[in-house]
Amino acid sequence: MPPKARTAVSKAAPSEKTAAAAKPAKSQAKTTAAKPLTNGNTSSRKRKAEDEASPQPELDAVAPLPKKTKTEAAAAKTKAKKLFPEIGKKINDAPTQVLDIYVFGEGTSGELGLGSKRVNGKKPIDVKRPRLNDNLSSDSVGIVQISSGGMHAAALTRDNRILTWGVNDQGALGRDTTWEGGLRDLEKEEDSDDEDEDDTGINPNESTPTAVSNEHFAPGTKFVQVVASDSATFALTEDGRVYGWGTFRSSDGILGFTEKIKVQQTPMLLPTLKNIKGLSAGSNHILALDHKGNVVAWGCGQQNQLGRRIIERNKLSSLIPQGIGLPRGKTVKIACGAYHSFALDKNGHVWGWGLNNFGELGLQSNAGEDDAVVLKPAKISYLEDYNITDIDGGVHHSLACSDKGELLTWGRVDGYQVGFEFDKLTKDDVIYDERDSPRILVKPAVVPDVANITSVASGSDNSFAVTGDGKVYSWGFSANYQTGQGTIDDIKTPTLIDNSAIRGKKIIGAHAGGQFSILAGVADAAAKVNGVNGA
């Protein structure tokens, strides 16, 4: 896959060389091809759903049913009422630190959450550097935790609401975003020289952060975490339960949300998941860590990212959360790349499994082969000399930081995903292509000139590293301004993000989508509260 034509979704579409990969995504390169009329409900750059709705069956005419008595109607209404299990014992603490949220990147599908109209002369799309999102104000909204998916995002507020925004093609937002926006002639708009149009034509119901209805959750439910994949969202509760909505995709299109449900448009409780302490989302798979230190996985397993072999004729079994072959009771942290997974154990070991065709697992065996996968969790020996505290993965690269603040990277290098200039790479640790150009950094390497790193985050082909004193570095692919550096040129090495919006602010987290990114900073004098549904 050429470096300038990467996927449009975070941890989503694999390279052309990825075996059994998910549906190929659009190139990020701009095109001059004519575009048809498009309904305003859907962004021109959204993923096209591959699965068309089945025609409705013809029904024989039947006699009208007799009207129900008042007693029968009341009974039917009671029966239709959602039943939830009782709230269990608290095992998780809800976050309380209120955050300022800064966004940047493309935003043409509403994933920046800036709405659909120009505000104070600024467009809600093509944001080159970090911009404070007033729709997520620390005063009036109060975000305490946030997650970015491929083309959507989700956030948890201090008063226990879940907000979603971005692409809602397969129910990823968990709410109705129908919009009577009418038809737009996109070709005419692109040819227009008028840059002063206040309304971008983006669906305001998708591009404006909006709460998911509480009616889908058990009364008294308190949330502690949300995670977003490419086409789904999941929420973890204080008592270790998990709600989810959306769908998982495979190379054939929509795989399903459960064995019986193709697309879940609104939140539903996943009944088999209990005592969960943390979640992590890949492109189309989820990991969950329980209170005993065990890990379960579900979703699409075509690249063995679930840690178990999936037989094609029984592929829907991958949608059932099942355990992974890790040492029992020892896992303390989980993380996902697009098609690969990681686990950190209490003894300081790092385990990896899933896709490894660009050495993204940090395992040299079969790295560089088109169909390279690691079926079962394998210990990453190259990381044994470091006490890894945080880890993340993109489509074909990964990064981590140690307890000493070191930044380590590995995997695909042709788009500067690993933050090294080519002449600084150690030849013995690199696989070269047929043109003798660096292709894969097989062995995790410490990136020079950055220190005190406390957390890391990866987009498709770009990355972030946050320091203990609240600064943030970015590097990699930047065609849609997703590095926050104000340029569409690749950023070769970790570079400090510095503009008036975040200068002097303490950044404590970075979150990378496909063509957009999010920074979370400590809000000035923000309240620390987290309410309860129905309170």
Specify the residue positions occupied by each region the protein language model found.
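Conserved core positions of repeat-based scaffolds
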Residues: V103, H152-A155, T164, A232-A235, ...
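Blade-level signature of beta-propeller repeat domains, shared across WD40, Kelch, NHL, RCC1
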Residues: G470-V472, F477-N480, Q485-A535
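Loop/turn-rich, solvent-exposed surfaces of beta-rich toroidal or solenoidal domains
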Residues: G393-H397, C401-E406, R412-Y416, D436-Y481
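An edge-strand/N-cap motif at the start of beta-rich repeat modules
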Residues: F84-K117
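Ser/Thr-rich, low-complexity intrinsically disordered regulatory regions
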Residues: M1-T96, A527-A535
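Surface loop/turn motifs at the tips and blade-to-blade linkers of beta-strand repeat domains
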Residues: L136-S137, Q145, N214-A218, T258, ...
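Conserved beta-strand position repeated across blades of beta-propeller domains
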Residues: R131, S147, A155, V227, ...
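Fungal eukaryote-biased detector of long internal structured cores
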Residues: L156-G171, R175-G181, K188-H349
